[in-house]
Amino acid sequence: MSKKSSVEKNEARKALVKRFAAKRKALLEIANNDALEMEERFEARLKLAELPRNSSATRIRNRCGMTGRPRAYYRKMGISRVALRELGNRGLIPGLVKSSW
């Protein structure tokens, strides 16, 4: 089980990303537009740098929905391998059977 503070910190980052997504996207489009003047593009970069660091989507960490574990995360299911194995052994995931050969 992960520390509650780590999970909460990640949730706060998700909220910030959602809040600043439109503004960040607009500034990036201006900054990467070669048709605009260099001065205007530079100002867009400065405004982008003023946004909160945690409003960038790259700072979000995928975490298990059950345990908060940050590693061995299966995107399709939203859980870690440990939780997947546990639920699979209990028969709570339809279609998942233990391999045998």
From Swiss-Prot:
GO terms for cellular component: cytoplasm; small ribosomal subunit. The keyword Ribonucleoprotein applies. Keywords: Ribonucleoprotein, Ribosomal protein, RNA-binding, rRNA-binding. GO terms for molecular function: rRNA binding; structural constituent of ribosome. Pfam families: Ribosomal_S14. Coiled coil: none annotated. InterPro entries: Ribosomal_uS14 (IPR001209), Ribosomal_uS14_bac/plastid (IPR023036), Ribosomal_uS14_CS (IPR018271). GO terms for biological process: translation. PROSITE patterns: RIBOSOMAL_S14. Part of the 30S ribosomal subunit. Contacts proteins S3 and S10. Belongs to the universal ribosomal protein uS14 family. Binds 16S rRNA, required for the assembly of 30S particles and may also be responsible for determining the conformation of the 16S rRNA at the A site. This is Small ribosomal subunit protein uS14. It comes from Methylobacterium radiotolerans (strain ATCC 27329 / DSM 1819 / JCM 2831 / NBRC 15690 / NCIMB 10815 / 0-1).
